Every structure is written in C-alpha cells, then in structure tokens.
Amino acid sequence: MNYLVMISLALLIAGVDSARDAYIAKNDNCVYECFQDSYCNDLCTKNGAKSGTCDWIGTYGDACLCYALPDNVPIKLSGECHR
C-alpha cells in the first residue's frame, strides 16, 4: 500500500508532459508553407518537436507537420487563416 502512495505522489510531483502530432501554426492560425522536409524538420525541432516533415498536398496544402510537438506551441485549428 505504501508503494502505491509513493508512486502516485511521484507522478503528481513530476507532472506529465504531453505532445501531439499536428500542423504547426503562426499566431494568426496560418500554417507554415513548405517545399522541403529539411525546412519543416528544422522549424519543428526548434519548437521542441521530435521531428517534422513537409506534408505535400495535405489537408492544408503544402504545410509543415510536426511530430511530438509540445502543448505550448500553436497548432492549426479549424477555421480560417487570419492574415
């Protein structure tokens, strides 16, 4: 029983970091357009993702898709781009 309490406390203290696979977005809900995977990989990793790729002819056109992107980085939400 004591072990269960200690493990629970350790998890609460450590916190849980989550990440998501998503299209990285600018503050105006516009995606980053791309032509090369290397551009997206650099952009995504600089923002804390594990990696990134250029998703050609995807949902949002040619846009950067990041893998394991932290929750504090903006992603493309449904709705229009507000340029």
UniProtKB/Swiss-Prot annotation:
GO biological-process terms attached to the record: defense response
Span of the signal peptide: 1-18
Expression (tissue specificity): Expressed by the venom gland.
GO CC annotation, single: extracellular region
Alphabetized PROSITE patterns for the sequence: LCN_CSAB
GO molecular function terms noted in the UniProt entry: sodium channel inhibitor activity; toxin activity
Domain LCN-type CS-alpha/beta: start-end pairs: 20-82
UniProt keyword annotations, A-Z: Disulfide bond, Ion channel impairing toxin, Neurotoxin, Secreted, Signal, Toxin, Voltage-gated sodium channel impairing toxin
Disulfide bonds: 30-81, 34-54, 40-64, 44-66
InterPro entries: LCN-type_CS_alpha_beta_dom, Scorpion_toxin-like, Scorpion_toxin-like_sf, Scorpion_toxinL, Scorpion_toxinL/defensin
Protein's UniProt keywords contain Signal: yes
Chief place of localization: secreted
Origin superkingdom: Eukaryota
A Pfam family it matches: Toxin_3
Cross-referenced SMART domains: Knot1 (SM00505)
Keyword Mitochondrion: no
Task of the protein: Binds voltage-independently at site-3 of sodium channels (Nav) and inhibits the inactivation of the activated channels, thereby blocking neuronal transmission.
Family to which the UniProt record says this protein belongs: Belongs to the long (4 C-C) scorpion toxin superfamily. Sodium channel inhibitor family. Alpha subfamily.
Domain free text: Has the structural arrangement of an alpha-helix connected to antiparallel beta-sheets by disulfide bonds (CS-alpha/beta).
Protein name: Toxin AahP985
